[in-house]
């Protein structure tokens, strides 16, 4: 393990990768306001490049605001891809934020409302498209809002069936 002045020095072959949501976290919580300044995705990539990180991961909306126009989305992704190239970083993984929007209060892929399930699929496909453009080989499906109240709002077998259908659909899309 390479050491510099007694400290670990990360090398690209160690493949340290960080999420935009972790490095860019402003330090707010339910009990207080943000305590750190906002960092743009480009600033985060530059910082990660400076410390020797190998990669950067992201949720769709960590990079592209949910209300971005298609042209804005394309510009943002293009500029981010260039920032990664300029700083020697790869994007190994993307995921989709299926938890922040109030639409997902009842789940995303397992929601009772078919319009919410369709919205979740559209967001996931958009995240997959971003991932392809950035060279990511992995899409993470994190079900943070799936099933937390399954017993109270739907049968577990129905939730599992809906999740299976969503994953199968996304596999076909890929």
Which ranges hold each PLM region?
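Short, conserved phosphate-binding/catalytic loop or strand-edge motifs used
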Residues: 141-147
């Amino acid at each position: 393990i390479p050491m510099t002045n007694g400290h670990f020095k990360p090398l690209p072959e160690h493949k340290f990768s960080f999420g935009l949501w972790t490095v860019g976290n402003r330090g707010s919580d339910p009990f207080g306001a943000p305590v750190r300044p906002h960092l743009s995705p480009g600033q985060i990539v530059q910082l990660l490049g400076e410390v020797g990180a190998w990669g950067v991961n992201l949720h769709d909306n960590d990079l592209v605001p949910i209300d971005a126009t298609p042209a804005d989305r394309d510009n943002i992704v293009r500029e981010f891809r260039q920032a990664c190239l300029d700083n020697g970083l790869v994007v190994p993984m993307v995921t989709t934020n299926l938890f922040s929007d109030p639409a997902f209060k009842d789940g995303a892929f397992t929601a009772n409302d078919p319009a919410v399930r369709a919205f979740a699929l559209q967001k996931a496909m958009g995240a997959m498209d971003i991932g392809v453009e950035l060279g990511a080989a992995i899409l993470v499906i994190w079900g943070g809002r799936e099933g937390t109240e399954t017993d109270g709002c739907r049968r577990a077998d129905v939730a599992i069936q809906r999740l299976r259908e969503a994953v199968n659909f996304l596999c076909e899309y890929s």
